[in-house]
């Protein structure tokens, strides 16, 4: 089977969630509007995640993995997924499954016209502190990037791979994916998706990661925006 769409699943110490991830993504792949494969990126997990991932990939032909030597963070895991994917479309979902894989089909409806389609979590099922810190962080980021996105941290996105592979990722830049597509003169849109409470495992981001960390990342983004090279080839004979 020729795959058209790769779902990247970053994993860090998610042993309690992975069998549910397998079940949900396997079910989604049967109803997906594009031929879909799954790529786990094990971000240096210290629990049994790697052994579980290998077992999942052994019994499913459309599941593969890469595994880091040590923990490098979510941005690195997403970047590695972009680099290793061989399909025309890439997307990602968190391994906590607080978003529904079936909603990828909602995003795929728009990927022909847009270069990045991101979910925006409707009726978020997180704590008051987490919701408020995310809203404040999104407001700060939006004032820097002017990307018009309300929920750039939503872990459900679809991107054309030729755009994704040109993103010069740095730590924290996963929050700026729509803005980085706009720097390439691409088109972005946000679509409401479902959101659920975390069932197992522990959240990897605290108040610092959600609020204070992104503020410093905004200045890194502004530096990159000034230095970013975006060229278009008019002609070639390659």
Task: Report residues per predicted region.
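Hydrophobic helical membrane-anchoring modules
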Residues: 1-3, 139, 146-147, 170-238
């Amino acid at each position: 089977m020729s795959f058209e769409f790769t779902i990247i699943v970053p994993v860090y110490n998610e042993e309690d969630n992975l069998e549910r991830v397998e079940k949900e993504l396997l079910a989604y792949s049967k109803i997906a509007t594009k031929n879909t494969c799954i790529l786990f990126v094990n971000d240096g997990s210290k629990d049994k995640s790697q052994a579980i991932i290998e077992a999942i990939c052994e019994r499913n032909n459309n599941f593969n993995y890469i595994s880091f030597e040590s923990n490098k963070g979510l941005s690195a895991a997403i970047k590695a997924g972009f680099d290793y994917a061989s399909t025309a479309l890439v997307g990602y979902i968190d391994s906590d499954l607080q978003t529904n894989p079936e909603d990828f089909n909602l995003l795929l409806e728009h990927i022909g016209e847009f270069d990045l389609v991101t979910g925006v979590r409707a009726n978020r099922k997180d704590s008051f502190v987490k919701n408020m810190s995310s809203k404040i962080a999104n407001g700060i980021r939006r004032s820097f990037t002017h990307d018009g996105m309300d929920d750039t941290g939503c872990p459900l996105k679809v991107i054309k791979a030729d755009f994704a592979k040109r993103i010069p990722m740095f730590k924290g830049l996963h929050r700026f994916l729509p803005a980085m597509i706009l720097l390439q003169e691409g088109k972005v849109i946000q679509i409401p998706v479902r959101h659920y409470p975390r069932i197992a495992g522990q959240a990897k981001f605290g108040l610092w990661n959600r609020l204070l960390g992104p503020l410093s990342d905004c200045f890194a983004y502004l530096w990159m925006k000034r230095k970013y090279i975006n060229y278009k080839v008019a002609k070639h004979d390659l």
